[in-house]
Amino acid sequence: IEAIRCGGSRDCYRPCQKRTGCPNAKCINKTCKCYGCS
């Protein structure tokens, strides 16, 4: 899976929602970590 670059966790919400269906995400070391639905 291609890494999603980010400057903050809110940069990840939309791309992670597109990828996993839920916007649960954090920005870690300038890349998004998508957690999917919990």
UniProtKB/Swiss-Prot annotation:
<keyword id="KW-1220">Voltage-gated potassium channel impairing toxin</keyword>
<feature type="site" description="Basic residue of the functional dyad, important for the interaction with Kv1.2/KCNA2 channel">
    <location>
        <position position="26"/>
    </location>
</feature>
<feature type="site" description="Aromatic residue of the functional dyad, important for the interaction with Kv1.2/KCNA2 channel">
    <location>
        <position position="35"/>
    </location>
</feature>
<keyword id="KW-1015">Disulfide bond</keyword>
<keyword id="KW-1221">Calcium-activated potassium channel impairing toxin</keyword>
<dbReference type="GO" id="GO:0008200">
    <property type="term" value="F:ion channel inhibitor activity"/>
</dbReference>
<keyword id="KW-0964">Secreted</keyword>
<protein>
    <recommendedName>
        <fullName>Potassium channel toxin alpha-KTx 6.4</fullName>
    </recommendedName>
</protein>
<feature type="disulfide bond">
    <location>
        <begin position="22"/>
        <end position="37"/>
    </location>
</feature>
<feature type="disulfide bond">
    <location>
        <begin position="16"/>
        <end position="34"/>
    </location>
</feature>
<keyword id="KW-0632">Potassium channel impairing toxin</keyword>
<dbReference type="InterPro" id="IPR036574">
    <property type="entry name" value="Scorpion_toxin-like_sf"/>
</dbReference>
<comment type="similarity">
    <text>Belongs to the short scorpion toxin superfamily. Potassium channel inhibitor family. Alpha-KTx 06 subfamily.</text>
</comment>
<dbReference type="GO" id="GO:0015459">
    <property type="term" value="F:potassium channel regulator activity"/>
</dbReference>
<feature type="site" description="Important for the interaction with Kv1.2/KCNA2 channel">
    <location>
        <position position="28"/>
    </location>
</feature>
<feature type="site" description="Important for the interaction with Kv1.2/KCNA2 channel">
    <location>
        <position position="33"/>
    </location>
</feature>
<dbReference type="InterPro" id="IPR001947">
    <property type="entry name" value="Scorpion_toxinS_K_inh"/>
</dbReference>
<dbReference type="GO" id="GO:0090729">
    <property type="term" value="F:toxin activity"/>
</dbReference>
<dbReference type="GO" id="GO:0005576">
    <property type="term" value="C:extracellular region"/>
</dbReference>
<feature type="site" description="Important for the interaction with Kv1.2/KCNA2 channel">
    <location>
        <position position="30"/>
    </location>
</feature>
<comment type="function">
    <text>Potently, completely and reversibly blocks voltage-gated potassium channel Kv1.2/KCNA2 and Shaker B (Sh). Also blocks small conductance (SK) calcium-activated potassium channel (KCNN).</text>
</comment>
<feature type="site" description="Important for the interaction with Kv1.2/KCNA2 channel">
    <location>
        <position position="19"/>
    </location>
</feature>
<feature type="disulfide bond">
    <location>
        <begin position="6"/>
        <end position="27"/>
    </location>
</feature>
<keyword id="KW-0872">Ion channel impairing toxin</keyword>
<dbReference type="Pfam" id="PF00451">
    <property type="entry name" value="Toxin_2"/>
</dbReference>
<keyword id="KW-0800">Toxin</keyword>
<feature type="site" description="Important for the interaction with Kv1.2/KCNA2 channel">
    <location>
        <position position="10"/>
    </location>
</feature>
<feature type="disulfide bond">
    <location>
        <begin position="12"/>
        <end position="32"/>
    </location>
</feature>
